[in-house]
């Protein structure tokens, strides 16, 4: 659920598509995913966020879509020229960059102004890569640091060296599904079956 800068309330569902209610109408309307050309798998709506141009980006199990605030229509966005439809699991807007986390295909950073894309993947042979290619959660703390939750643990992006530092390694079958920051600079890390971890970003 999200309220955009125009006051529109967006409600994304697992199988019922995209619902929205503007400040003026006070009633919910639904974007029919079948009418936009989306396939059945696209009805499984995942993460979403709003960019500086008031466009709403939506991740699905079968690709990345965005809602054009000028034309009030949805469009599919391919992260690669080969028109590969990634399984999008997490989104984070950071300035002009849209961070896109996928299942099994790593992390992709899209510059919304230039259209350039930088991709990051896990490699056992290269140090300081992602913990895993399953990027399930993305979070920017109040200091501006970006944390990446994966199916093997939590890592932090290092902009100076353009790589990643492992913060918490929870191992297999314990995906980092959500990240929350409290007023004491603690990050609360929710996992799929290992409980909750607390990480202090100061100490």
Q: Over which residues does each language-model region extend?
A:
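Carboxylate-rich, polar loop motifs that coordinate divalent cations or form catalytic acidic clusters
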Residues: 1-203
């Amino acid at each position: 659920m999200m309220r955009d800068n125009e006051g529109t309330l967006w409600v994304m569902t697992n199988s019922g598509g995209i619902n929205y209610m503007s400040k003026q109408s006070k009633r919910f309307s639904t974007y029919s995913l079948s009418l936009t050309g989306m396939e059945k798998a696209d009805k499984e709506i995942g993460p979403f966020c709003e960019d500086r141009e008031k466009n709403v980006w939506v991740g699905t199990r079968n690709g990345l879509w965005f809602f054009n605030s000028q034309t009030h229509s949805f469009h599919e966005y391919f992260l690669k020229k080969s028109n590969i439809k990634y399984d999008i699991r997490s989104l984070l807007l950071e300035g002009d960059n849209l961070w896109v986390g996928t299942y099994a295909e790593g992390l992709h950073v899209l510059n919304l102004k230039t259209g350039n894309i930088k991709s990051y993947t896990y490699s056992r042979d290269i140090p300081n890569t992602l913990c895993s290619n399953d990027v399930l959660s993305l979070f920017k703390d109040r200091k501006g640091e970006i944390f990446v939750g994966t199916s093997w643990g939590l890592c932090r992006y290092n902009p100076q060296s353009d790589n990643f530092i492992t913060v918490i390694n929870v191992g297999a079958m314990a995906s980092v599904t959500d990240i929350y920051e409290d007023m004491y600079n603690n990050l609360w890390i929710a996992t799929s079956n290992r409980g909750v971890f607390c990480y202090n970003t100061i100490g």
